[in-house]
Amino acid sequence: MEAPVISGIAHDRSQDKITIVGVPDVPGAAARIFAIVAGTDTNIDMIVQDVSAEGTGLTNISFTCPDGDSAGARAALEAARGELGFKSLHFNPDIGKLSLVGAGMRSHPGVSAKLFNALSQAGINIHMISTSEIRISVVVDDAVLDEAVRAVHSAFGLDAQTAEAVVYGGTGR
């Protein structure tokens, strides 16, 4: 039996987003940044690195982490600003993560397009995107997370009535 394309939608409000702006785009920069963050016992969930702005040699790196870990990560990064050479640190505690989950995504092109279209039609901006073979996650403003979940549920038919389950019982004889 083939797995359904999408088996569920999950959401998470317990994360913060940290963006390190103006990171020198050189080998080892990300390694050093995440070694510093690891030293604070911060668990990283999603990571996005922008393409370097042409001619600047600088990039931005954003990541999400549990909201209880973000203060330590921010403090450690600020303390290492001179060593790391970044321009500024931005912090956003008002984010939510929506994840679309399903083993069937591997063999069905267009799932991400459908997800992004559903969010677009609802007027919801995406801040970060992360994918794997069985999951697509997006970060959106926390204020619209519930609306995002409803829009995606509707787009993938997860809000439809499921088939009726019929149970036949016997006497056991």
Report the location of each language-model feature.
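A conserved regulatory-domain signal marking ACT and ACT-like small-molecule sensing domains
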Residues: 1-173
